[in-house]
UniProtKB/Swiss-Prot annotation:
Species this chain originates from: Prochlorococcus marinus (strain AS9601)
BP GO terms, sorted: photosynthesis
Protein keywords: Membrane, Photosynthesis, Photosystem II, Thylakoid, Transmembrane, Transmembrane helix
Membrane topology: Single-pass membrane protein
Pfam families reported in the protein's UniProt record: PsbX
TM segment ranges: 26-46
Protein name: Photosystem II reaction center X protein
Functional note: Involved in the binding and/or turnover of quinones at the Q(B) site of Photosystem II.
Predominant subcellular localization, coarse grouping: membrane
GO terms for cellular component: photosystem II; plasma membrane-derived thylakoid membrane
């Protein structure tokens, strides 16, 4: 662990570069949530509700 910290200190990263990288990473997480997680969740809720209605109407016949 000590060698890794020395390597990072010796690389002389600026705070601006680290900040921009962190902002980009957070932006990627948000984009992934909007493009993948939200539509998948909506689809699963829709299918779940439809299946529940089908089972309810089938049981009453």
């Amino acid at each position: 662990m000590f060698q890794i910290s020395n390597l990072l200190i010796a690389a002389d990263f600026s705070a601006e570069v680290a900040n921009n990288s962190a902002v980009g990473m957070i932006g990627s997480f948000i984009a992934a949530a909007l493009l993948i997680v939200v539509p998948a969740t909506a689809f699963l809720i829709f299918v779940s509700q439809k299946d529940s209605l089908d089972r309810t109407s089938t049981g009453r016949r």
